[in-house]
Amino acid sequence: MFPYVTDYSGFAIRKWMIDNVDVAGFLCLLYLGLVWKGPGVVKSLREKNLINATLLQGVFIMWNLFLSTFSVIGMIVVVPAAIAHISNKGLVPALCERDVNMIYDSPVGFWVGVFALSKIPELFDTVLLVLQGKQPPFLHWYHHTTVLIFSWQSYCEGSSTIFVFVAMNLTVHAVMYFYFAMCASGFKAIMRTIAPVITIMQILQMIVGSAVTMYSAYVLYNPQPDGPQTCDVTKASARMGVVMYLSYLYLFAALFVESYLKPKKRTEKSK
């Protein structure tokens, strides 16, 4: 599948990302400025009727359909390869030994590289939310900024565990962005039933991510005489991954409890 990337090598992209690592920082600063100041600017624009709500909704739908399609195609390539890689090498060697075919070379390497770079245009999600007059919640902008930084670092260093994170993220995003597109298209009542399923998928993703990052950190700080002496992950990346995934796990679990388990407060009309 995708023969045009059979001989692909991502080392040129890796070099560009290493040489321009400051770009990730500048983008995050601009992004946070949008999150904090954007809603106020947009409010004044909406009061002057300078934003076309119908056009904006159409762009929102098409953008989410594009991201869902992108994720599906990437998932079709990366997920089977990740499963085969773990099956052939064993779980521990697959996680701790760098394989360039799972990071930089081959169709899988192509999609891992595209995935790392895709975290930049994904910030457009927030632009659309702000233009709709919404204040992005903490989980939304925290997730976008930290994923961008972590993906950039993991790809540049050739983290041996990156393929796991890519496979999981593409799978969840394939469903999540399709859900957003359908809700915006007028099918919210129908799609509402799968909303808890998506949050559960996200929680499972964070559980696996936490386990993988904690294991790699454990091996790095506690080499085993009868086991792996090290993992091809830097200590900085391992620490960042542990903090990031554990914080995600807490935030998504809290979101699930708040959204689906807590009893809803009744309004005056419903009393």
From Swiss-Prot:
Catalytic residue list: 143 (nucleophile)
InterPro entries: ELO_fam (IPR002076)
Pathway: Lipid metabolism; fatty acid biosynthesis
GO CC annotations on file: endoplasmic reticulum; endoplasmic reticulum membrane; nucleus
Keyword terms: Endoplasmic reticulum, Fatty acid biosynthesis, Fatty acid metabolism, Glycoprotein, Lipid biosynthesis, Lipid metabolism, Membrane, Transferase, Transmembrane, Transmembrane helix
Membrane disposition: Multi-pass membrane protein
Transmembrane segments: 16-36, 59-79, 110-130, 162-182, 194-214, 241-261
Taxonomic superkingdom: Eukaryota
Coiled-coil regions listed: none
Single biological process term from Gene Ontology: fatty acid elongation
Positions of glycan attachment: 52
Compartments, as annotated in UniProt: Endoplasmic reticulum membrane
Record GO terms (molecular function): fatty acid elongase activity
Knockout consequences: Genetic disruption in bloodstream form parasites reduces fatty acid synthesis from C10- and C12-CoA primers.
E.C. number(s) listed in UniProt: 2.3.1.-
Pfam assignment, any one: ELO
Enzyme's top EC category: transferase
Catalysed reaction, written as an equation: an acyl-CoA + malonyl-CoA + H(+) = a 3-oxoacyl-CoA + CO2 + CoA
Motif HxxHH motif: chain residues: 140-144
Record's function text: Involved in the synthesis of fatty acids. Elongates C10 fatty acids to C14.
Similarity annotation: Belongs to the ELO family.
Descriptive protein name: Fatty acid elongase 2
